[in-house]
Structure formats: structure tokens, C-alpha cells
Amino acid sequence: MIALVMFLIDQGTKYLIASRLEMYEQIPVIGNFFLITSSRNRGAAFGILQDQLWFFIVVTIAVVAGIVWYLRKMTKEGRKLLPTALALVLGGALGNFIDRLLMGEVVDFLQFNFGSYTFPIFNIADSCIVIGVGLIILDTILDGRREKLNKLNTSREVSGTEGNE
């Protein structure tokens, strides 16, 4: 459900930008700090791998298939954070995938300026992917701590049992 909602928000915002703004047209939202800027990207984050459409299509299909398979597995385990993270990545990956498949490029529009530095323009799908990956890292850290606590508790139980015999 999260993946679908984020996909729809991503596609809806991209449609609004592409249909109502000329290329590179800007709308200041918060002064010069945050602007809506109509842009297109034929590559990945920060403009890398420009014009590698088939590479992105193949990689995205593999990633989406892996996430869907893993999400089905995760629902049986009752975990919450990792499935949410994967759903965000899935929604974002599908949003950019559809753009690439239908237009050969991705619609970007969120621009942030920090003084004289302009952060690369991005979109909702990119945000979902970055937040999802961040949550995957957080889940990995938390899961590692849970495993250490479980091992510690198990070793205490074993040593406590042996001492009572």
C-alpha cells in the first residue's frame, strides 16, 4: 500500500510539473532556498550514467522483482521497519521506471539551494528511494543490536541453567 501511494504521489506531481511548467521554469517556494524547477534527467542521481536507458530498465526490473519477493517473505515474519523501507524503495523505483519507460527520461522538480551551492534537482521517487535506503540501514543496525542482545540473553540463560545443576 505504501509503495502504491508513493508511486501515485510521484506520478501525480510529475504530471503537474510536466504539463504546467516549461522546461527550467522556476517557482520560488521559500525564497531562493526551495524552488520548484521543471527539469529532466536521462541518468541517475547527480546525473551519472546519462543515456543508459536499457541499463536502468534491466536493473529496475531486477530490483523490483527482488523487493516484491522479499516483501512477500517479510510479511510472514511480522517485521515492520524493513517492509516499510522496501515499500518506499519499490514505490520510488517504479515511479522513475515508468518515466524512463514512457519518456526515456525522469521528470525532476525539487530544487534546494544552500548559499551558492545548488543541490541536484530531484523528485518524490528519488526521495522515497533515499529515505527507504536510510531506513534499511537503520533496520540493519537495529537488527544487529537485537541479535547481540538475544545472544547475550541466551548465553546468560545457558550459564544460569548449568550453574543450578
Q: Language-model segments: which ranges?
A:
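Alpha-helical transmembrane bundles and membrane-interface segments of multipass inner-membrane proteins
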Residues: M1-E165
